[in-house]
Amino acid sequence: MEILMASSNLIKQLQERGLVAQVTDEDALAERLAQGPIALYCGFDPTADSLHLGHLVPLLCLKRFQQAGHKPVALVGGATGLIGDPSFKAAERKLNTEETVQEWVAKIRKQVAPFLDFDCGENSAIAANNYDWFGSMNVLTFLRDIGKHFSVNQMINKEAVKQRLNRDDQGISFTEFSYNLLQGYDFACLNKLHGVALQIGGSDQWGNITSGIDLTRRLHQNQVFGLTVPLITKADGTKFGKTEGGAVWLDPKKTSPYKFYQFWINTADADVYRFLKFFTFMDIEEINALEEEDKNSGKAPRAQYVLAEQVTRLVHGEEGLIAAKRITESLFNGSLGELSEADFEQLAQDGVPMIELEKGTDLMQALVDAELQPSRGQARKTIASNAVTINGEKQSDPEYIFNDEDRLFGRYTLLRRGKKNYCLICWK
């Protein structure tokens, strides 16, 4: 695995991985990194109760910088989360209550923590919350000390805002328009508090980052830098990080480790080697060798399994990975003996389609209710043709009624038609 130690080459190494979309004054930043460790930050606004896959690249970028000896600051936006970032958003965000946002702040801080080392000496990570400096600031201070440094002419010409201003059906409120000032002040504040010299974020944050650079120069006469990572796209043009069920979350209660693992297993061949560069710490040579091996093997590529394993371990730890692989193996082989009650809970959460049934239901009706067959008549034929299994065991009796032995842990039965059509029955 690649540990990015040579700070002067760090930007080039990130570029080789495709992880740099834009950077301000690249030569000066490279020179500053060559002089020794810096502090850098990335902000995470609590717009939900969990981070999602879109946050993973900048979060891992913080980790890459820390591995190279720099000091990462993870800023959770307890204040900015109350306002909402308008950047490239088609419509105004819904405002959440202060209580809700503070709950989300606590959850996101907890989620960020395992990715960074908060106890490693001089480059130990710092967790910050911008509510600490905005919560007690009054409007006059905001307008006099921050607002006077921002030109409205420049603000309305920023691409992220311009798109909203040009839409007839959606303008932009003063609340969202002021977001740029808040994020800009975050940079200036962190520069003063912790000597932060670099902000990283998604490429949609470029306008906010450059505002922070300008404000820091005006308030503190310090040169600071910005670097954006690309917004991840898929080769087929569809949005990355979404499934039919919505976003892929980092919280295991919202997206189970099993479903998370499956998301990566289903990565297209056209994307997988690029994603290995974005989402893992494998070195480039190792990834290129794997690509070459897959091309020449004549078999199904191994890259998806490597990617799924690496990223699931990063996000859910060894235990989450082992559970995800165990469930995958059991479903593939139809042998459920290895599954724990917690594994079934993962499947019930979002692993496979699920229905609740009353005890006494027969097999034909279960197949219809589970939408594995359109009618009892069709279900009868399918059962008789030996195409149905209950908990991995074939059942060919159309009149079969489920019994207590079928209810694993007193609650779960896995019904399968053919090789790939599953439904988990949860008994009432």
Curated annotation (Swiss-Prot):
Cellular compartment(s): Cytoplasm
One GO CC term on file: cytosol
InterPro entries per record: aa-tRNA-synth_I_CS, aa-tRNA-synth_Ic, Rossmann-like_a/b/a_fold, S4_RNA-bd, S4_RNA-bd_sf, SYY-like_C, Tyr-tRNA-ligase, Tyr-tRNA-ligase_bac-type
EC number(s) given by UniProt: 6.1.1.1
Domain S4 RNA-binding: 361-418
Entry-linked SMART domains: S4
Name of this chain's protein: Tyrosine--tRNA ligase
Organism the protein comes from: Salmonella arizonae (strain ATCC BAA-731 / CDC346-86 / RSK2980)
Lineage: Bacteria, Pseudomonadati, Pseudomonadota, Gammaproteobacteria, Enterobacterales
Underlying gene: tyrS
